[in-house]
């Protein structure tokens, strides 16, 4: 995982995200280790909100998997936790990052944002 390369990849994310303020997506400073759906002042989709209530924490591994397919990740998480009835709708995040190394690098960068 290379945080410097991840910072370059993160430029794609800046359409919707910033480190220090909510935009279309939530602020990402401190996201690693944060409970899903809890960035202050951000209005989350029900899918994200329910995932946080069901115990989803944004570990580096979870974010790497999430970035490949956000909706599929959250729906699987809720279903695996016995909350299939809440695994409906969609997250606001429609972007998918297919390249696994880029996902690892961007998460390494996110981990530096405090």
UniProtKB/Swiss-Prot annotation:
GO terms for molecular function: electron transfer activity; heme binding; metal ion binding. Binds 1 heme c group covalently per subunit. GO terms for biological process: photosynthesis. Coiled coil: none annotated. Gene3D superfamilies: Cytochrome c-like domain. The keyword DNA-binding does not apply. It holds the Pfam family Cytochrom_C. GO terms for cellular component: periplasmic space. It comes from the Bacteria. Heme c binds at residues 13, 16-17, 93. It is found in: Periplasm. The keyword Magnesium does not apply. Keywords: Electron transport, Heme, Iron, Metal-binding, Periplasm, Photosynthesis, Pyrrolidone carboxylic acid, Transport. The modification Pyrrolidone carboxylic acid is found at residue 1. PANTHER family: CYTOCHROME C. Cytochrome c2 is found mainly in purple, non-sulfur, photosynthetic bacteria where it functions as the electron donor to the oxidized bacteriochlorophyll in the photophosphorylation pathway. However, it may also have a role in the respiratory chain and is found in some non-photosynthetic bacteria. Belongs to the cytochrome c family. This is Cytochrome c2.
